[in-house]
Amino acid sequence: MEVDTATFVRLHHELLCAHEGPSIISKFDAIKKVKLGTLANQSGGANNITEAFFDKLRNFERKSEAYLASDLAERELTRDTHKAIVFVTKSVLLGGKSLKDLLPYGVIVCAFIFIPETASVLDNVRVMIGNQKRPLTVALIKYMAKSLNCDLVGDSYDTFYYCNSSAYGKNLISVSENDFSNPQRALLSVGDLCYQAARSIHVAAANYIRIFDRMPPGFQPSKHLFRIIGVLDMETLKTMVTSNIAREPGMFSHDNVKDVLHRTGVFSPNHHFSAVILWRGWASTYAYMFNQEQLNMLSGTSGLAGDFGKYKLTYGSTFDEGVIHVQSQFVTPEAVRKRNIYPDLSALKGGSS
């Protein structure tokens, strides 16, 4: 599927700056101005300016958006770079990695900036910067940094992008300030687009809706699959909410703030879904990024609502059995009309299986 790269980058740039702009500026500012040598050279601790920036980073660390080594004041610091900014998608952490796993070599203070999952579709679009191949995703990072007046490279820090693709020989890719020409058009795989959409709804379920914090009674990760249906428009969500709550009182609850239909009754692996979520990524990016023909393809039988629209991902749980296995599936109004996704639960009320 051919897309306009400028539109793709602009949409994700607007999303990132609108929701995270002040936070991004604050992270760059703290990494740039905090002086590690001050800690090592002053027995009484850092000066007030350095301590203020460390406080900023500690606040980000408490939100799992930064990493600070525990023994900074005792370390023997050289003139090498010890600080970094790393851009990464949330799904990398949901996949089992910790922030420490994402640190560039030698870095002991790092701030992390999370980009939308769908932006990583550009990982497989390669551009040449100097004599090196880089993912087009770095164009988004460079565009964002320029618009927010953030320096990607400083005297004592560098900026990196953690890339999931193996096409570049390593995951951590340095983001330099060198200019390069973006291709006007890029070919994207429909399968890649659908997979990133599934990762996007998985991150939303885990981090923002926090649906895995409250599992249905009787749910066992070793036996059961947690099924999430992602809907692309509010009308479809309303239809599913009305149909299920009316037919099976007490089995579901609806959160109209987070736009999610929860399964709260007795759990059975035979049930077709555990939760229904409105996926906002469709309206905020895809609907603007593609023409009508491309949107029809994605919402048809070969796209999100068809062959490519079902993915199994995992989420680390507090259960003794280990991870929760999650199946994400998208439906469109057309898919709802063509098949029954509202199973009769009357036979399941006697107990869990």
UniProtKB/Swiss-Prot annotation:
Function statement: Suppressor of RNA-mediated gene silencing, also known as post-transcriptional gene silencing (PTGS), a mechanism of plant viral defense that limits the accumulation of viral RNAs.
Family: Belongs to the phytoreovirus non-structural protein 10 family.
Protein's UniProt name: Suppressor of RNA-mediated gene silencing
Organism listed in the record: Rice dwarf virus (isolate Fujian) (RDV)
